[in-house]
Amino acid sequence: MGHVTSPSKRYPASFKRAGSILGVSIALAAFSNVAAAGCEYVVTNSWGSGFTAAIRITNSTSSVINGWNVSWQYNSNRVTNLWNANLSGSNPYSASNLSWNGTIQPGQTVEFGFQGVTNSGTVESPTVNGAACTGGTSSSVSSSSVVSSSSSSRSSVSSSSVVSSSSSVVSSSSSSVVSGGQCNWYGTLYPLCVSTTSGWGYENNRSCISPSTCSAQPAPYGIVGGSSSPSSISSSSVRSSSSSSVVPPSSSSSSSVPSSSSSSVSSSSVVSSSSSSVSVPGTGVFRVNTQGNLTKDGQLLPARCGNWFGLEGRHEPSNDADNPSGAPMELYAGNMWWVNNSQGSGRTIQQTMTELKQQGITMLRLPIAPQTLDANDPQGRSPNLKNHQSIRQSNARQALEDFIKLADQNDIQIFIDIHSCSNYVGWRAGRLDARPPYVDANRVGYDFTREEYSCSATNNPSSVTRIHAYDKQKWLANLREIAGLSAKLGVSNLIGIDVFNEPYDYTWAEWKGMVEEAYQAINEVNPNMLIIVEGISANANTQDGTPDTSVPVPHGSTDLNPNWGENLYEAGANPPNIPKDRLLFSPHTYGPSVFVQRQFMDPAQTECAGLEGDEAAQARCRIVINPTVLEQGWEEHFGYLRELGYGILIGEFGGNMDWPGAKSSQADRNAWSHITTNVDQQWQQAAASYFKRKGINACYWSMNPESADTMGWYLTPWDPVTANDMWGQWTGFDPRKTQLLHNMWGL
């Protein structure tokens, strides 16, 4: 067989780093409705140390409520953040309406949500007080169904009919919407714009739709009036309990219907988030709420996330028997054709999804290349593939679509990452039209340089013999194509698009302008998606055809160098012109197994100050992982955006916990032989602690173990030095990484 060398995800001289996520368990939790009728306190999720909850206010009178204020108090529980209301006090708490949700028509419901900690106690259900909490009737909870009702709307749900991945509450007001000043956009409520005359706008810190655009929809959609009428929702038409009440326009349930005061729901009509809904088939509303947290259909979306790669292309060795120096696009699956006397390991993608879900995963980042979208590209088809025939794809495009659909069936959310301009150029690109020389051009003893490939049609050096021309127009076309997959495949799990991986070669001004165009392109096709924006680097313009004219980029302290994709230092003062509830910042950050940064140097070795990478190795510099120093850099580079209310989802973090020992390259073992402690594991622990404390979500790189500088969550017998012939084989989960991730997620 042709031996396949592991694709090094990045040359160790590349500048990258990453983070982690504070996850929320999805256990189905019964709620308690106390307080006077008209107000409900609903526990929507709970885990060991915390919970999420909502307060729902139903107007059960015959008069319009203009403005509301409610209060509640705990014994030991405390609120840590709140969205869609103004919060005051500190146990007791008070919450009042925002400008857009203060008016409640008779028979209608509004809600706001919050997250809290139990402080070693149990999850409480306190009484809610306020003038709006009078009149009507309260709800009841049975042993196998969860139903709430008010005097103005009624619902009937049979036992065992609630199956939801995000909430345990189904309210009878699911078919009632707030009327006036809103647009029912194909089943989803948005505010009507005041000053925007056509298309979509952004006013009062929220997305809105112009009256002319809203009115152009076919019936029954359009501008929502003040009247109400009964509606009947058929079996399997309501997607999860997020449809149980009217939610904010920017995060409303896609299963809301224009207006009603009563509804009938059959025994199978409340289903998981992967089911169909009244909205456009295959779509789900993904938003970032005012607290910077991810939501789906108005409910908090747990983001226990990992990377699963391969479809973006790998690097084959120059002596491969079938595909020398090729770049096949094939998801790693732990089942290579030559294993077990060519019978394969038996592992399937479904098996891996099942195992990942059992470990807590709710979300996956899926890297691709532009060529992945081409079903006819030979690098996505046999005979250039290595997976066992039992799981082998027909082509890379089909594999992409099949993976998305299978993840949807497993209630795993997906976001697609355009990982490079070319499956051959790979991680090196840094820009759409990247040209060599690349960062690994002079790497000693390395078989996988790609100096003969360029993504630019012009101004290439003499080393280039193969051009995969890529530019902004092709990129925007790819974004539109990906945005259309939700409708094409009939799925509701495509969160958004990570528009380009590690754009380290742009200045912030350049990258900001590009992502604004990316937003417009995506939004034209799919207004339900998020736009996921990575950071830049500390320098720009090295891959633009002028490698000697690198431009320094502001990133805060020069002693704290950002990795590729980490630098969002300028984003707070000069953010992209993208609605805040559609924008998700996604920096990358890594420890020493990927690149030894200057901030890792032992301050006791003054001769090592400012050194990094190979220079630090040659000087035999010691590595000291100081969380205080690391956090200063993270705060400058992206952490401060959390306090500004932006959503942050770290796109990549992770590493080889045994570096520079087991599983490391021979070059790293030689260069860093004086390092005998678990410095990369220490770095990962510091990162996980920081992100958990900040409430920042993150995606671990990677689930599969074929990344040469990080390995994976899955263990492998492969070792590039002692067991190179075991490449592509998986065993169980690395218990150290399991503990790291479970601690970070609160599991």
Curated annotation (Swiss-Prot):
Residues 227-281 have a biased composition (Low complexity). The active site is at 502 (proton donor), 652 (nucleophile). The keyword Zinc does not apply. Disulfide bonds join 39-133, 183-214, 193-208. One of its GO terms (biological process) is cellulose catabolic process. It is an enzyme of class 3 (hydrolase). Keywords: Carbohydrate metabolism, Cellulose degradation, Disulfide bond, Glycosidase, Hydrolase, Polysaccharide degradation, Signal. InterPro entries: CBD2, CBM10, CBM10/Dockerin_dom, CBM10_sf, CBM2/CBM3_carb-bd_dom_sf, CBM2_carb-bd_dom_sf, CBM2_CS, Glyco_hydro_5. Residues 1-37 form the signal peptide. PROSITE patterns: CBM10, CBM2, CBM2_A, GLYCOSYL_HYDROL_F5. GO terms for molecular function: cellulase activity; cellulose binding. Residues 226-283 are annotated as: Disordered. Its EC number is 3.2.1.4. SMART domains: CBD_II, CBM_10. Residues 280-747 are annotated as: Catalytic. Residues 38-136 form the CBM2 domain. The keyword Cell cycle does not apply. Residues 182-211 form the CBM10 domain. It catalyses: Endohydrolysis of (1->4)-beta-D-glucosidic linkages in cellulose, lichenin and cereal beta-D-glucans. Belongs to the glycosyl hydrolase 5 (cellulase A) family. PANTHER family: ENDOGLUCANASE (PTHR35923:SF2), MAJOR EXTRACELLULAR ENDOGLUCANASE (PTHR35923). This is Endoglucanase C. The gene is celC.
